[in-house]
């Protein structure tokens, strides 16, 4: 996931990973 912050990146990663 591409994000400016680790928190946002982590949230995106979880969202994509649980897709």
Swiss-Prot record:
Keyword ATP-binding carried by entry: no
UniProt-listed Enzyme Commission number(s): 1.12.99.6
Keywords, sorted A to Z: Iron, Metal-binding, Nickel, Oxidoreductase, Periplasm
GO molecular function: hydrogenase (acceptor) activity; metal ion binding
Subcellular location: Periplasm
Full protein name: Periplasmic [NiFeSe] hydrogenase large subunit
Lineage top rank: taxon: Bacteria
Subunit-level organization: Heterodimer of a large and a small subunit.
Keyword Transcription regulation: no
Enzyme kind, highest EC tier: oxidoreductase
Needed co-factor(s): Ni(2+); Fe cation
Main location: periplasm
